[in-house]
């Protein structure tokens, strides 16, 4: 008899068929309590769980006593109580490598769009304001040869440093938990403490996961240390930034502009002051959102679950100790 799994994400037919070749699949729209109650027997017997964006917590796990592996279609997993999974010897799989280049493209796009005011001036053209040769009121600032500060030198940070160094001749500073020799050798990146990075960088790009240590790592003190000409980019997790402090820094001219792919609350409230600022480029968490990469992420998550339920967790496992 095939193992049974719960699927809470719509997959392309070919990937669904791949799952069905290995498992008995129960598809549900979400992991809300009423959904779990409606499919109580399927949840109780499921050995695998596959999807994204829903909360996976102790309350859910109590309804899934047979669960052995969970696979998220994402690199981040702050919506999952990893400690609770580990305590129950449930492995968590994620999709870190397949989205690296696409997210780095998004970060670079935010840097360019914000510095060159692409969104702002495009909207002015559409509004009929381009009636004569443009003057300084339409100008942005250069990106090439400016100093880039990367906070979080993981895979995405490395891909961003590559683009900045080779494509835009940007000096690269970085701050991370540990030195990254490859970044220093390949991109002449300079490791520094966070305060130094904030004081020297023209672009501060945050690519951090959300942890107890990184929550509100960026607040009023950090924005005050940045150049008034600095551009702040957040493509990690929204709660890494105190959004009220960011709004105040933008309103007070402490920093020049911001490009944001993530927010403290998502979707972003229509009442957010950020939406009324011409020096803010705000996009709806599109970091990995291309057709190609989202498909590859789903395929990776499917393969991860198949591997995990066969005892193969050599790659893409968040908590390998759970299998011990």
From Swiss-Prot:
Q: Where in the cell is it found?
A: Cytoplasm
Q: What does this protein do?
A: Catalyzes the NADPH-dependent reduction of glyoxylate and hydroxypyruvate into glycolate and glycerate, respectively.
Q: Which GO terms describe its cellular component?
A: cytosol; plasma membrane
As recorded in Swiss-Prot or TrEMBL, the protein's gene is named: ghrB
One MF annotation (Gene Ontology) recorded for this entry: hydroxypyruvate reductase (NADH) activity
| Keywords, comma-separated and alphabetical | Cytoplasm, NAD, NADP, Oxidoreductase
Establish whether keyword Oxidoreductase is in the entry.
yes
Q: Which residues form the active site?
A: 237, 266, 285
Q: What is this protein called?
A: Glyoxylate/hydroxypyruvate reductase B
Which Pfam families does UniProt cross-reference here? 2-Hacid_dh (PF00389), 2-Hacid_dh_C (PF02826)
High-level lineage: Bacteria, Pseudomonadati, Pseudomonadota, Gammaproteobacteria, Enterobacterales
Q: Does the keyword section mention NADP?
A: yes
Q: How does it assemble?
A: Homodimer.
**Which family is this sequence assigned to?**
Belongs to the D-isomer specific 2-hydroxyacid dehydrogenase family. GhrB subfamily.
Q: What is its EC number?
A: 1.1.1.79, 1.1.1.81
> What organism is listed for this UniProt entry?
Salmonella typhi
The UniProt catalytic activity note for this protein reads: glycolate + NADP(+) = glyoxylate + NADPH + H(+); (R)-glycerate + NAD(+) = 3-hydroxypyruvate + NADH + H(+); (R)-glycerate + NADP(+) = 3-hydroxypyruvate + NADPH + H(+)
User: What Gene3D superfamilies does the annotation carry?
Assistant: NAD(P)-binding Rossmann-like Domain
Which NCBIfam families is this protein grouped with?
PRK15409.1
């Amino acid at each position: 008899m095939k193992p049974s799994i719960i699927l809470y994400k719509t997959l392309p037919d070919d990937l669904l068929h791949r799952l069905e070749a290995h498992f008995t699949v129960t598809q549900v729209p979400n992991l809300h309590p009423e959904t779990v109650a409606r499919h109580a027997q399927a949840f109780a017997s499921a050995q695998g769980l596959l999807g994204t964006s829903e909360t996976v917590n102790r309350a859910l796990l109590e309804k899934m006593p047979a669960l052995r592996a969970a696979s998220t279609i994402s690199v981040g997993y702050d919506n999952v109580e990893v400690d609770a999974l580990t305590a129950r010897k449930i492995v968590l799989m994620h999709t870190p490598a397949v989205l690296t280049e696409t997210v780095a493209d998004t970060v670079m796009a935010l840097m360019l769009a914000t510095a060159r005011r692409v969104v702002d001036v495009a909207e002015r053209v559409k509004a009929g304001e381009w009636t004569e040769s443009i003057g300084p009121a339409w100008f942005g600032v250069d990106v090439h040869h400016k100093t880039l500060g990367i906070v979080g030198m993981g895979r995405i940070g490395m891909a961003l440093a590559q683009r900045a160094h080779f494509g835009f001749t940007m000096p690269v500073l970085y701050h991370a938990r540990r030195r990254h020799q490859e970044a220093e050798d390949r991109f002449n990146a300079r490791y520094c403490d966070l305060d130094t990075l904030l004081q020297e960088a023209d672009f501060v790009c945050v690519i951090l996961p959300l942890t107890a240590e990184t929550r509100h790592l960026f607040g009023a003190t950090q924005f005050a240390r940045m150049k008034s000409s600095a551009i702040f980019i957040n493509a990690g997790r929204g709660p890494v930034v105190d959004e009220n402090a960011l709004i105040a820094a933008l309103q007070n001219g402490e920093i020049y502009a911001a490009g944001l792919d993530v927010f403290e609350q998502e979707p972003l409230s229509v009442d957010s002051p950020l939406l009324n600022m011409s020096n803010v480029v705000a996009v709806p968490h599109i970091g990995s959102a291309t057709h190609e990469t989202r498909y590859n992420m789903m395929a990776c998550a499917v393969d991860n679950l198949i591997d995990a339920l066969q005892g193969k967790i050599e790659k893409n496992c968040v908590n390998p100790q759970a299998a011990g």
